[in-house]
């Protein structure tokens, strides 16, 4: 069951004195009910903006040079993927439109197999590290108890191997845009 229910997309603008604006857009992923879906979401997050080879990082930071940082984060408890961007106030429209355009590219499979392979390798390395991280193992155990969804790291790693470009595209098509939050100065 998803903790947060998708509703109509909302925009929230907040003004405070600061040196750079922060833009956060959420996408509802729905409940993560099995290891295949979990693996696809982990790979999507890495491809999207969760790593330096991510589509948004390369487009917004390296290609266009309009943001200070780009990140994405999956909250599997609430079924939400957050995309965070630090940018100047004047670049809000360009950033927002670029994110929408990048999602359209993901939906139509317009990303390279090389990036998919890279993302899968990163996720698998993190899962290997997780085997030896006591705190992470405790968090996984607690989340398994809370959600009644057992995360077996070795099986999750096998599922990551099987994620395809088509899986990523289907996931991108299923995302529902949620709240957009823009914190900026005047």
Question: Where are each of the predicted segments found?
Answer:
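Non-catalytic beta-strand/loop surface segments
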Residues: 1-35, 46-97, 156-179, 186
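M16/insulysin-pitrilysin zinc metalloprotease superfamily fold
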Residues: 71-130
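C-terminal regions of mature proteins
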Residues: 117-186
């Amino acid at each position: 069951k998803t903790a947060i229910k998708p509703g109509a997309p909302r925009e929230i603008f907040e003004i405070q004195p600061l040196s750079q604006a922060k833009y956060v857009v959420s996408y509802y992923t729905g409940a993560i009910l099995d290891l295949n879906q979990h693996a696809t979401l982990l790979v999507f997050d890495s491809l999207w903006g969760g790593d330096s080879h991510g589509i948004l990082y390369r487009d917004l930071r390296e290609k266009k040079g309009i943001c200070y940082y780009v990140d994405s984060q999956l909250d599997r408890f609430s079924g939400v993927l957050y995309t965070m961007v630090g940018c100047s106030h004047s670049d809000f429209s360009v950033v927002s439109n670029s994110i929408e355009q990048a999602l359209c590219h993901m939906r139509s499979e317009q990303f390279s197999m090389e990036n998919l392979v890279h993302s899968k390798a990163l996720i698998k390395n993190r899962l290997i590290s997780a085997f030896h991280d006591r705190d992470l193992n405790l968090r996984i155990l607690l989340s398994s108890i809370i959600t009644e969804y057992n995360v077996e790291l070795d099986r999750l790693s096998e599922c990551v191997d099987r994620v395809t470009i088509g899986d990523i595209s289907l996931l991108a098509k299923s995302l529902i845009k949620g709240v957009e939050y823009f914190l900026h100065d005047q």
